[in-house]
From Swiss-Prot:
Subunit structure: Homodimer.
Site (Transition state stabilizer): 179
SUPFAM superfamilies per the UniProt record, alphabetical: Phosphoglycerate mutase-like
Name of this protein: 2,3-bisphosphoglycerate-dependent phosphoglycerate mutase
Pathway(s): Carbohydrate degradation; glycolysis; pyruvate from D-glyceraldehyde 3-phosphate: step 3/5
Function statement: Catalyzes the interconversion of 2-phosphoglycerate and 3-phosphoglycerate.
Catalytic activity: (2R)-2-phosphoglycerate = (2R)-3-phosphoglycerate
Keywords associated with the record: Gluconeogenesis, Glycolysis, Isomerase
Entry binding sites for substrate: 8-15, 21-22, 60, 87-90, 98, 114-115, 180-181
The EC number(s) this enzyme carries: 5.4.2.11
PANTHER family named among the record's database cross-references: PHOSPHOGLYCERATE MUTASE (PTHR11931)
Length: 237
């Protein structure tokens, strides 16, 4: 039966600085690198043999996947990168300090932007420092200027169906190294989590989430490999 392993990237510099990161290509901290390697060690210790890695086009996710595979002694695994696995686009909040933004707009409003399912932050103004339209990794793509979790799901799900699911249906073990919200979108889809509950699902950094699937890609079991840093999981079935 197919197995899916979800791995949220390790701590990034802007995680450390408490800034809205979104699509900004921030690298891992030393702690983030250690988290990624630990994730790979856990995968190896569990006897999991990865057949393919999918990741975003953002450095922190790419490096997390590569470091994990290297630590698991599986660096030969094919890797596919796609922007549709990117983190949620935080629009006009991109680059801002979260605490300072809450002081300016109020905690309630910022909480709505961050944690509501279908209310996005203000749009990113074109031509600014964080305008990604001229970044060559997105050449030919129709890019968002802001996203909610709902629109992140709309972006991620077609890629899941067209590119990732066929490998799982073929019985492969797939690792996805990505971001909190793109992984949350996949969890919502697989476990059919209600809209008002998915925003409360937390995915810890660097802790592999192993999901056992049946032939129809319905979850039959799920577990974090590091129990000490595990978060609550949606119910299976």
């Amino acid at each position: 039966m197919p197995t899916l392993v979800l791995l949220r990237h390790g701590q990034s510099q802007w995680n450390l600085e408490n800034r809205f990161t979104g699509w900004v290509d921030v690298d891992l901290t030393a702690e983030g690198e250690a988290q990624a390697r630990k994730g790979g060690e856990l995968i190896a210790a569990a006897g999991i043999e990865i057949d393919r890695l999918f990741t975003s086009v953002q450095t922190r996710a790419i490096r997390t996947g590569n470091l994990a595979l290297d630590a698991a002694k599986q660096s030969f695994v094919p890797v596919t990168k796609d922007w549709r696995l990117n983190e949620r686009h935080y629009g006009g909040l991109t680059g801002l300090n979260k605490a300072e933004t809450a002081e300016k707009h109020g905690v309630e409003q910022v909480t709505i932007w961050r944690r509501s399912y279908d209310i996005p932050p203000p749009e990113l103004a074109p031509g600014g420092e964080y305008d990604f339209s001229k970044d060559r990794r997105y050449k030919g793509a129709s890019l968002p200027s802001t996203e909610s979790l709902a629109t992140t799901l709309v972006r991620v799900l077609p890629y899941w169906e067209s590119d990732i699911a066929p490998h799982l249906k073929a019985g492969e073990t797939v690792l996805i190294a990505a971001h909190g919200n793109s992984l949350r979108a996949i969890v919502k889809h697989l476990f059919n989590v209600p809209d008002d509950q998915i925003v409360g699902v937390e995915i810890p950094t660097g802790n592999p989430l192993v999901i056992d699937l049946d032939a129809a890609l319905k979850p039959t079991g799920a577990r974090y490999l590091d129990d000490s840093r595990a978060e609550a999981l949606p119910k299976v079935g």
